[in-house]
Amino acid sequence: MEPDFADPLIAVRDLRKVYKVRGDKKAATEFVAVDSISFDIAKGETYGLIGESGSGKTTTGRMVLALEKATSGSVHFEGNDITTMSELDMRRYRKRMQIVFQDSGSAFNPRRSVGAQIGFALERFRMADKGEIRSRVLDMLSRVGMEAAHYDRYIHEFSGGQRQRLGIARALITDPDFLVLDEPTAALDVSVQAQILNLLKDLQQERDLTMLLITHNLALVEHMCDHAGVLDHGTLVESGPVDDLLTTPETALTRALVDAVLEPAAVAS
């Protein structure tokens, strides 16, 4: 299904995050991590949030998911402002909003099988009986390119690429509408990056997923995204269609990111 740009699933408005920083024997000072940014993500779209380390992109992703409280501003999911909701009210949205981390292995308990952990959300949200959970997880493992035998294994037994596939399975098991991808391929070889990105694109088409891709790499955005924004020290300095960012960048930072873009074949092959 094509994205519906007239009907955003996610609407971010003037989102701001300020941390209190207390130094040795000094009064607390304020650090503005994210400074009043706004963007929309259409249903079925992948929106890219590009920035260097420390630019505020991961903090933004966490606020969009209501995993971190915003200092001010709003995030609307289907028209409902989730920044003002209690955790109890947010519970009905949690299964519809999921995240894939840079190192999915770190999100797994090393003492429990990966299959049991992937299936836990089905139990938590009462989406399947205990007798159904294993079969649902096995189906999902198969869909992300893993094997049934992997269900009972532990996270340390898998390669980086396999860990990302497991992280994707864990995120998708609740059949979410919205997925945040936080540097999902940063720690992987280029050939494995391509496999993971192409898997995500296939899954997006199958499931009509809306996605926020957080990355420092404009080549990934070129391959995955419709629209994107560039973050610099917490400020959204440029945003728009990806083609415009690539062909007519307006800021020095965006031009530098364009200059660093890999050949598309290196990502998409």
Question: Where are the language model's segments positioned?
Answer:
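ABC ATPase NBD coupling module
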Residues: 24-28, 82-98, 116, 124, ...
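Conserved ABC transporter NBD signature motif
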Residues: 73-81
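Conserved ABC ATPase "signature" region
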Residues: 81, 132-149, 258-259
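Conserved ABC ATPase signature
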Residues: 154-158, 162
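Conserved catalytic motifs of ABC-family nucleotide-binding domains
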Residues: 175
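A short, surface-exposed alpha-helical micro-motif characterized by mixed small hydrophobic
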Residues: 221-223
